[in-house]
């Protein structure tokens, strides 16, 4: 692993370890460029840091950036949802805190007029809502890549025309907008453990389509434990799949 841009901390409420723990693990693993990207503290309820934590998160990472200068390059990022009514707020936070980048994690949106988790959708309406919501977010031009692009397949029960159409339209949008798609290693670990109730993600047919449509790929550890960064087995498997089997262009860095 030379680079990783999908890294969480305890602040999001569903990961363990401090910023220092992850940076130390990355340095031990020989990482050259690490991006920290914990979940944004939105002004609406959801998964993410608590309100007021963003300043501490950034301050700690700036301290670590100085400590590890010459050993590891550290970028300060966030994994962000897309909430149309709050994007000006997000732009202000990025400017105020000097955030280097954001990646899109499209977890939540509206399905049939109600807020829903896209990783739990099981019907065509859910797939369509995920597609429309995610593409609208990407069209803002704010996101450096799309994390776990096929999250909508996590609980979806079968590969059918609706699933294929959704994946193809999403892949085409990412290609046309020049937004890389992430092969998500946290999802891969969950697949292995049987933790996805449906097709799951990463899902091979999505990646076949992404290759056919000319998407650019990234690999993200989506680390929720520092020790995840110490094992490159899944990274190497993903790299071989993307580069050798699928013949896709893979980026090492978003900078």
Feature map (PLM): residue ranges:
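An N-terminally biased module of ancient metal coordination in phosphate/nucleic-acid-related enzymes
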Residues: 1-84, 89, 96, 159-170, ...
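Charged catalytic cores and adjacent phosphate/nucleic-acid-binding surfaces used
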Residues: 1-9, 19, 142, 153-154, ...
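Divalent metal-binding pocket/active-site signature
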Residues: 16, 42, 101-193
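Non-catalytic positions within long, well-ordered alpha-helices that form the structural scaffold/packing
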Residues: 27, 95, 138-139, 211
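Aromatic- and acidic-residue-enriched segments that line the glycan-binding/catalytic groove
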Residues: 91-94, 99, 196
